[in-house]
Amino acid sequence: MGQNLSDEQPQRRSHEELTHELAERFRSKCFTSLEFYSLKDVFKSLADQQDSIRYMKEDTIARYLEIPDILGASPVIFQMVSYLGAFPFLQDAPVVLELPRMIMVIVIMTERYRTVLARGSADRTKLLFRSLAVFDRKPSESDALIPDAAQLDEPNGKDEKVQENSHVAGFAVDQAGDEVDDDDDEDDDLVLTAFELLDVKEAVDQGHAPKFHSATIPTDNFRKLLMLLLLAAPLDPQESLSLYSPHVVGEQLEGLRATAECILASFVNAETSTGIKYSHFKSIIPVICPNLFRGFNGLFEHFLFSKNLDFSKHQNDIPITKVAQPLLTDSGEILNHNTLCQISLFLPGSDLFRRVRLLYSGNDAGFSMGSFQTKVFNWQAPTLLLVSGTRLSDIPEGGQEVAFAASLPTKRFPHGSKSDQLTFGVYVREPWKHTHRECFGDADTVLFQLEPIHDVFPASTINKDYVTFTKAPAHHPMLSFGCPHPHPSQAHRKADMLHLGPVSLTLDDSFEFAVFNHDFTSRGGAFRSSSVRKFDFQERFQIESLEVWGCGGDAEARAQAERWAWEEREAEARRKINLGTGDIEADRALLEMAGLIGGARSGGSMG
């Protein structure tokens, strides 16, 4: 019997022992031998030491990652890593950042988390929210402690010492909580995943865990983090963040801040709320910015590249100041460095950074469907269309504005935001073409808004009214996204009335006016309704800038240049048919017969 009791109650391991074992599992699953050697070398060169403990401080991490002071993001990052380093014993946060803790941090902060977290990005989103959040305890529970999964009773002395001495900005309580009231049922799975790696068999006892309420990410902290993530979006692991320092001064900094504000507006109304709730956080990130935290990859994988292991560097080499290759080879009125980084939050950066080129600009080539067609239709790779302008007044002013309003159904929706400056865009994967009978595009088409609120409207897989390009004398010449094709069979409708899709963007054929329609209560459109603004709204605006950018490399650019050259030669050949013979009088007579010159311009009528 004594033997049986011994088997039923194995010796329990301390937090520290389990943490070291989990760190070892993370290391073996997520790092190569060379990467871990580099991490140890970097840690050794940076760590401070107190007694026998070697650890990383906030200013050390900020300095090594080269986080610009002007962003104010260093305390936010240190709050995150001090929390994530406690995984899976999150009730112990904030913790001293020893090497095992840094292993946890780097795995969770980079794409390497996919091999160790059961639900991948969903688990990581939960952890990142908690690492950013401020937790308020109910007064009656302020002294309660959260039992860990194994009901361990051995204290972790070093972690308690850190809690007493911690001055991490952003923590509202000494001990960060392990519960988010919106998602309690998923907590067991997240923690158990880690304990399964450790072969800890005891069940998670959440019955006595204190409940947290009003867990929120402070708005200002998230604003600072957004600016850092936008700056780091194109960062390669072996690149230095300081290469992008020109983008945090002067007008570039103001542009970065403005872009961050547009994204922040999707998460919270900064004027009326002080924080972001988890339920909203987890529901909109997969839709409007699934790549939001990808900037952490290049930032934190920096720890895995030791300068002492740079075999391309010679001993007596003089350091050379590097300059980041520009993300854009052309300048645009809408698309700039910050806007491109914003778009990379929901489209792959590998298709955008240093791979887009300006195909069409209305202010350069003219606002007409003909010039649009000439510049865009020969591009055989994905494109980005961007349009910006100023909201029209509710009462039309001037003849053209009145005519545009008359072509639309009576406006019955309010505006979608307070700002009058609007920017929308569409990602089109298929090559452009005329839509004589049906729309073109596929389920990878994305409709989005960049300003003043960042919003994304993914394509439906059922309704395929993605893109319409119809020129006169079509029933309704226009460029639209998400609208039914204007078939002649619809002539029984009012001849001058456009049919707007539930979620759609429509530009008139002169590219002078546009309308974005969001009928949230309606279903079945080509694009899904907003996950941010769950109400009906409509934006009518005067177009000020219209751009189309080609996404692709040099091969696509060469192919388009060849097609352009061929079409130009063909057009020139058509112009020279029976001309250029040297007989000016004969050429003139031929043109007069065609009705192209001369006073009569009869065109050679036989009547």
UniProtKB/Swiss-Prot annotation:
It comes from Fusarium vanettenii (strain ATCC MYA-4622 / CBS 123669 / FGSC 9596 / NRRL 45880 / 77-13-4). One of its GO terms (biological process) is response to oxidative stress. Residues 333-552 form the TLDc domain. It holds the Pfam family TLD. InterPro entries: TLDc_dom. Belongs to the RTC5 family. One of its GO terms (cellular component) is nucleus. Keywords: Cytoplasm. SMART domains: TLDc. May be involved in a process influencing telomere capping. The lineage of its organism: Eukaryota, Fungi, Dikarya, Ascomycota, Pezizomycotina. The gene is RTC5. The keyword Phosphoprotein does not apply. This is Restriction of telomere capping protein 5. It is found in: Cytoplasm.
